[in-house]
Amino acid sequence: MTDKLIIFDTTLRDGEQSPGASMTKDEKLRIARQLERLKVDVIEAGFAASSNGDFEAVQAIANTIRDSTICSLSRANDRDISRAAEALKGANNARIHTFIATSALHMEKKLRMTPEQVLEQARLSVRFARNLVADVEFSPEDGYRSDVDYLCRVLEAVIDEGATTINVPDTVGYAVPELYGHFIKTLRERVPNSDKAIWSVHCHNDLGMAVANSLAGVMIGGARQVECTINGLGERAGNCSLEEIVMAVKTRKDYFNLEMNIDPLHIVAASRMVSQTTGFVVQPNKAVVGANAFAHASGIHQDGMLKARETYEIMRAEDVGWSASKMVLGKLSGRNAFKQRLQDLGVALESEADINTAFARFKELADRKSEIFDEDILALVSDESITHHDQEQYGFVSLAQHSETGERPHAVVVFTVAGKEIRGESDGNGPVDASLKAIETHVKSGAEMVLYSVNAISGSTESQGEVTVRLQNNGRVVNGVGADPDIVVASAKAYLSALNKLQSKADRVAAQG
């Protein structure tokens, strides 16, 4: 009999913890829809008790997504658990994921609790959560570095209280595959009631082994749930990569012999959406979703590919959503063709007004660029002004700049602040510097730019440039993304996008009080 492997995606929760990767409610909802198309089993939508913004995002996703289980993280206390349950009320299938640290280091230095106090807190929190929802996951934070005897006692107690999934995290990415696999196996063998719960793995990539450790937890340890993120997004070195786990299990079914619900045809679209939403560019040689993942430059390899694809390809690019023959749109393309392409790409805009706004932007772009590729469309709809233009504090209107060799560039930027048009102008070390300084003449954000990067969306000189700007202010870090055939305009859009996110974060912090 073939076992099922549950795919638990935490892009919207653990992935978002990567500095600068914070997402708006609308962005999270758009990604959640794509995860549902991908047929992810469980979507961890956020940490409902952490902020009003996170609560609203979890609530919106729970009210919208019908096929996937929707999960909220919570600490092991009644307030967090109650908040999670409230946010999940509209879900078809709801899960509360509660956690508390169990390693000696964390208990002593962070929690300042005794092992017995932690055990009791874990037990009571799972009992409380089970009174609110039928599906409860428990995680012993820093589980891999916990004492095995003590950890077995904790896990036995929470299963007795009704935990349906036991997730054992390698919180700091310290594990190596064989040892981690046997660690999971030992726990399952020594916890008397282990058969009453599904066992899960959650691995971080600090030593580059998150995927290998997760697969070892499955094959050696007997885990049947893997927690992962699109593109391996996550704090520090990231998390276990969903696309790599899925395609490893599918490609080597002869070895793993596991079934999954996942539809891999939507993997590339999910990867692009997360990358363009967060501004975290996928490296070209990234397995499965990198631009070079299916490219062959060696003459010997190319010759073999022409004779028989299987000589150098172990999986087909089109099986994960790479399109062999792309439909290219242009200025003569109509609204229906545009709407169909959005659907094919897994983009679901909430209203006809949003579609109309997106189509108007598409036509503007088509007047400047003869061919519109999928990447252009995804960049266009990832602009938050499409879906919540009424909520923007700052909006781009126009830009003019003058620069000559040997002269200091000058820029004039017209933008809106709370709906009112403002004209800023400034000199700078270059056209981009002048444009951003022109914005700051009125905004005076006090933010520090910690990252500025430019990426060509497609391969030609006619390509749009996609600019990512990362700003830091008072401990808050945000990414803004802007796209335009003019790199200077794209930079101004990205800067205003980042300022909007800084403002949104400040509002959420103020609301929390």
UniProtKB/Swiss-Prot annotation:
Q: Identify the stretch(es) annotated as Regulatory domain.
A: 395-513
InterPro entries given in the database record: 2-IPM_HCS-like, 2-isopropylmalate_synth_dimer, AIPM/Hcit_synth_CS, Aldolase_TIM, LeuA/HCS_post-cat, LeuA_allosteric_dom_sf, LeuA_bact_synth, PYR_CT
Q: Which CDD domains match?
A: DRE_TIM_IPMS (cd07940)
UniProt GO cellular component terms: cytosol
Where does the protein principally reside? cytoplasm
Gene Ontology BP, a term: L-leucine biosynthetic process
Q: Which GO terms describe its molecular function?
A: 2-isopropylmalate synthase activity; acetyl-CoA C-acetyltransferase activity; manganese ion binding
Q: List, for all copies, the residue spans of the domain called Pyruvate carboxyltransferase.
A: 5-266
Q: In which pathway does it act?
A: Amino-acid biosynthesis; L-leucine biosynthesis; L-leucine from 3-methyl-2-oxobutanoate: step 1/4
SMART domains xrefs: LeuA_dimer
Q: Which PANTHER family match?
A: 2-ISOPROPYLMALATE SYNTHASE 1, CHLOROPLASTIC-RELATED, HOMOCITRATE SYNTHASE-RELATED
Family assignment from sequence similarity: Belongs to the alpha-IPM synthase/homocitrate synthase family. LeuA type 1 subfamily.
Mind telling me what this protein is named?
2-isopropylmalate synthase
User: What lineage is on file?
Assistant: Bacteria, Pseudomonadati, Pseudomonadota, Betaproteobacteria, Burkholderiales
